């Protein structure tokens, strides 16, 4: 597999400009092979990333390579590890902190968020009429490995309907079989979030 870092840099700049990765928030990763992945280093502005702002991590969590000696893995690295282990076909995993992702956390009921039956759900693989689809929602903890452990536990028993999950009042994570697919998934999910927020503001007829 070719080095994905330049593609991740371009995606990060785009998401930064959209307001999804401000203040160094969020992290993007892509597999290098079946055993490791590049992930954005902690504390780096996503609007100014270079190829040097990454850490190569094994699926076991061991750091294999530092693009720069001062780099350290993102705080959410454990979430990416779990996604790649649970879904071996995934080649990329994107985690962003948009305003809408935080606002829709208010609409969650228990451990899931009901999604509206929008046409855009087809882009997430939902091809049924009047679909009833739920996005898994997880509690937010300062101890990120605890979040990762809960994701692993739930998804091992109840696989998600769509390749996305929401961490309450934190952000959304998506994954896909290519970098392009993962970016498309993120755009679709954020579109749905914007719809939910707008619909909440519209008075019923």
Curated annotation (Swiss-Prot):
GO terms for biological process: L-methionine salvage from methylthioadenosine. Pathway: Amino-acid biosynthesis; L-methionine biosynthesis via salvage pathway; L-methionine from S-methyl-5-thio-alpha-D-ribose 1-phosphate: step 2/6. Binds 1 zinc ion per subunit. Belongs to the aldolase class II family. MtnB subfamily. Keywords: Amino-acid biosynthesis, Lyase, Metal-binding, Methionine biosynthesis, Zinc. Its cofactor is Zn(2+). Its EC number is 4.2.1.109. GO terms for cellular component: cytoplasm. Catalyzes the dehydration of methylthioribulose-1-phosphate (MTRu-1-P) into 2,3-diketo-5-methylthiopentyl-1-phosphate (DK-MTP-1-P). This is Methylthioribulose-1-phosphate dehydratase. Zn(2+) binds at residues 95, 97. GO terms for molecular function: methylthioribulose 1-phosphate dehydratase activity; zinc ion binding. The keyword Metal-binding applies. The gene is mtnB. It holds the Pfam family Aldolase_II. It comes from the Bacteria. It catalyses: 5-(methylsulfanyl)-D-ribulose 1-phosphate = 5-methylsulfanyl-2,3-dioxopentyl phosphate + H2O. InterPro entries: Aldolase_II/adducin_N, Aldolase_II/adducin_N_sf, MethylthioRu-1-P_deHdtase_MtnB.
């Amino acid at each position: 597999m070719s080095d994905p870092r330049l593609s991740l840099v371009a995606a990060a700049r785009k998401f930064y400009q959209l307001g999804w990765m401000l203040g160094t928030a969020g992290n993007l990763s892509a597999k290098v092979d079946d055993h490791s992945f590049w992930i954005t280093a902690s504390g780096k502005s996503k609007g100014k990333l270079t190829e040097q702002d990454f850490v190569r991590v094994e699926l076991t969590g061991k750091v294999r390579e530092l693009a720069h000696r001062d780099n350290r893995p993102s705080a959410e690295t454990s979430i990416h590890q779990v996604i790649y282990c649970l879904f071996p076909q995934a080649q990329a995993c994107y985690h962003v902190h948009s305003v809408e992702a935080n606002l829709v956390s208010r609409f969650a009921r228990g451990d899931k968020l009901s999604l509206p039956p929008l046409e855009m759900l087809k882009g997430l693989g939902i091809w049924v009429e009047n679909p009833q689809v739920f996005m898994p929602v997880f509690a937010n903890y300062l101890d990120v490995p605890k979040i990762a452990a809960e994701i692993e536990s739930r998804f091992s028993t109840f696989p998600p309907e769509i390749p996305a999950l929401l961490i309450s009042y934190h952000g959304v994570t998506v994954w896909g079989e290519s970098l392009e697919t993962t970016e498309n998934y993120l755009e679709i999910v954020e579109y749905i979030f914007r719809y939910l927020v707008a619909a909440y503001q519209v008075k019923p007829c």
